[in-house]
Regions:
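Mid-domain beta-loop-alpha active-site segment that forms a flexible
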Residues: 1-3, 121, 186
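Flavin (FAD/FMN) cofactor-binding core of flavoprotein oxidoreductases
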Residues: 15-23, 27-31, 99-177
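A conserved FAD-binding loop/helix module that cradles the flavin
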Residues: 53, 75, 170-192
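Residue-level recognition of phosphate/Mg2+-coordinating polar/acidic sites
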Residues: 59-73, 79-130
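Flavin-dependent oxidoreductases
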Residues: 1-83
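Internal hydrophobic alpha-helix adjacent to the cofactor/substrate pocket in enzyme cavities
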Residues: 7-10, 185-201
Length: 209
């Protein structure tokens, strides 16, 4: 959540800013497992979010979500816990600029605000699975915060990996989906391009990290 701040201390992330987005899920509290696998929609390629989908946890619990609502500060998990006035002003600034100047972001923000409604979120989920149990059997679960990088020059959401560094430090500013699936080749890329080149001043042979 603070990768850009740390990078700025080293002279990087000059063109980027991190804007937090809150992801909230609805968790199914019923006893029957009405689905057994994760189910995803076709993503909207204009945005770096997967949309409302079904997740089956390792314990069998079913979740619907997440939302992608702008958070008010970087650790805005619940209420006013970890409130940060400076971050609030920064977040309002960038969200307002994108809302005014970028019609696609404006549509995204309006759509995501509607997902504060449990019934609306479930209606979105019904596009994937029609026979969903009653909304009364779903409860809001703990939220997560997505560290979304934006380009300050173009006011766009960055949808690719962003790495900056030199011989003194390496900064992963944006690690997007599929970050977990791509973790090994991505780690190889970072080691070969930054660590091996700048720290050890030698080439890494193909197939070695």
């Amino acid at each position: 959540l603070y990768a850009d701040k740390i990078a700025k201390d080293f002279g990087f992330s000059k063109d980027y800013e991190l804007v937090p987005f809150k992801g909230v899920y609805l968790e199914y509290k019923g006893n029957d497992q009405f689905i057994k696998r994760n189910i995803y929609p076709v993503p909207d390629i204009r945005f770096p979010f997967l949309g409302v989908h079904f997740t089956v946890r390792v314990d069998g619990k079913i979740k619907i979500g997440p939302t992608a609502m702008p958070a008010f500060w970087r650790e805005n998990y619940e209420g006013f816990n970890s409130f940060n006035f400076k971050e609030l002003l920064e977040t309002i600034k960038w969200n307002t600029l994108m809302f005014i100047k970028k019609s696609e972001f404006r549509r995204l923000a309006i759509e995501e605000m509607r997902k504060y409604s449990k019934s609306y979120l479930i209606e979105q989920a019904k596009m994937l699975v029609y026979n969903i149990p009653s909304a009364d059997l779903f409860r809001w679960s703990k939220p997560g915060i997505r560290a979304q990088l934006i380009d300050k020059r173009s006011l766009t959401l960055i949808q690719d990996f962003v790495v900056e560094g030199d011989e003194y430090s390496v900064h992963i500013l944006n690690a997007v989906s599929p970050a977990f699936t791509a973790s090994f080749p991505f780690a190889r890329y970072v080691v070969e391009k930054y660590i091996a080149k700048n720290f050890y001043k030698k080439e890494v042979k193909d197939g070695e990290v």
